[in-house]
């Protein structure tokens, strides 16, 4: 979204089993106002899938793999950014979002497998989305919607080659 830099850090990705979910984490972030995703694993397939979508559907979104997550967090904070870790063990989203929303540079950590305990100490905010086990994709979507206060629905995706024409029935797209 305009003026804010939101980037996802995906940790714990297992290439042999998490490709679809990690791709959907990136695409959800892209659609809901994130600028890009750092992937703390090597998976060129995920990176290429995400970049292909960004190329066709427009907008500025990067995806980089082989990121060392501890270094990424350290560098992000050194550059003045804040870190929000999505977890079912944090402070409930409605109780902390007003504190997070003013952050102009935000790294959102989304785990796949069990997240190392040190993440809770590295994060500026440990954010629970319901405090119940569910999808990391749903957590990211709800978090970004609350963070952007619904403004992501009016987002523009410059450079798109295709766009959807809203319709009550059927699928309508337009080549640009």
Curated annotation (Swiss-Prot):
> Pfam families recorded for this chain?
Trm56
* Keyword Methyltransferase applies: yes
Q: Which InterPro entries match?
A: Alpha/beta_knot_MTases, tRNA_m1G_MTases_N, tRNA_mtfrase_aTrm56
The positions annotated for binding S-adenosyl-L-methionine are 86, 111-115
Q: Which domain of life is it from?
A: Archaea
In the record, the note on similarity to other proteins reads: Belongs to the aTrm56 family.
- Binding partners and assembly: Homodimer.
Q: Could you identify this protein by its name?
A: tRNA (cytidine(56)-2'-O)-methyltransferase
Q: Which organism is it from?
A: Methanoregula boonei (strain DSM 21154 / JCM 14090 / 6A8)
């Amino acid at each position: 979204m305009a003026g804010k830099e939101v980037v996802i850090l995906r940790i714990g990705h297992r290439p042999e089993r998490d490709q679809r979910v990690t791709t959907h984490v990136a695409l959800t972030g892209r659609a809901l106002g994130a600028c890009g995703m750092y992937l703390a694993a090597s998976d060129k397939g995920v990176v290429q899938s995400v970049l292909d979508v960004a190329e066709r559907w427009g907008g500025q979104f990067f995806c980089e793999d082989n990121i060392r997550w501890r270094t990424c967090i350290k560098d992000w904070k050194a550059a003045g950014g804040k870190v929000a870790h999505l977890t079912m063990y944090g402070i409930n989203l409605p109780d902390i979002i007003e504190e997070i929303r003013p952050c102009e540079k935000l790294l959102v950590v989304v785990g796949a497998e069990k997240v190392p305990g040190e993440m809770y100490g590295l994060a500026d905010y440990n954010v629970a989305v319901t405090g119940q086990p569910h999808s990391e994709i749903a957590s990211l979507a709800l978090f970004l919607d609350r963070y952007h206060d619904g403004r992501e629905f009016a987002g523009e995706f410059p450079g798109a080659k295709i766009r959807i024409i809203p319709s009550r029935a059927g699928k309508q797209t337009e080549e640009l």
